[in-house]
Amino acid sequence: MIDSIKQLLQQEAQAVLNIPVTDAYEKAVKLIVEQIHQKKGKLVTSGMGKAGQIAMNIATTFCSTGIPSVFLHPSEAQHGDLGILQKNDLLLLISNSGKTREIVELTRLSP
């Protein structure tokens, strides 16, 4: 059992190490630093289905590290929850296809 857990943790650590640090990744990190740390905005994550679960996990993980973050359900955003968005907030929208209707609509509705 201990060996299985150890192997799982090693696989997870390797997966993190395998994340490519590209120009786009560096730009995303700089944008987060600028909008959240310098301009005092918050990270607002959103996604539908499994992508929504991932977005929710990202928001809670960021919160636990002291980075203001909240999950916004894209369907609820269309029915009054857009009020959570404020100046300098940064939207992180997650979609497997990039064509999820609710996410596309959220980009149109966002201030």
Residue ranges of model-derived segments:
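An N-terminal, well-structured beta->alpha segment
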Residues: 1-41
